[in-house]
Amino acid sequence: TLSLLDQRILKPSALRAARQQALLERFRQLGPDRGARLLFRGGGRLGANALALPDGTIILLDELVDLADNDDQVLGVLAHEMAHAEQNHGLQALIESTAVGAFLAWWAGDFSPLIATAPAALLQARHSRKLESEADMIAAEKLARMGIDPARLAEMLEKLEAQGAAPSENSERETSPAGESTEKWSDFLSSHPSTRARRDALREFSGRGGMQTSDSEANRE
């Protein structure tokens, strides 16, 4: 996967070695996944972003570092991606999407590819929203343990939204095909939770002090 991305999309990072090392040292403080690997790349057409590959590798793009106001905001995104890696979200989504697609293709038969693909897309979208929300809360816990306000991740989501890298709030207010009101319609079809919902959840966590271990964290330990 990384080789293919490097060949077709990503570029070598333009960040200086000292800058990369400083971010890498802070990344390692997020723990506890000692096997997590952080790589730096130029994003090309991906723009400001970070990626967690199915093998646990995390790729931080130069454009995201440039977009952030401070390193705490970068750490917020890295904590989110580390959560995906620790929980095997990338591999889980890959397995479930291919398994669901294969079953529906068998069930529908060759005569109806639309029936085979559309339900799989909806099922995977619902699952992806759950994983994104879970990763946000795990990231908030990691940041709080480092003494970083989880609101830094919320701030970064706002920046990404402004650049068009995250679902916009305007899209949440569109009209459904049935003419119904609309926030829930677009949120249901989205592959991620709405940016506003994610920001609100992170700031609610921050407002509670964010230092108490959640039930999900306790269950993982």
What are these language model-derived features?
Residues 1-220:
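A Zn2+-metalloprotease active-site environment signal
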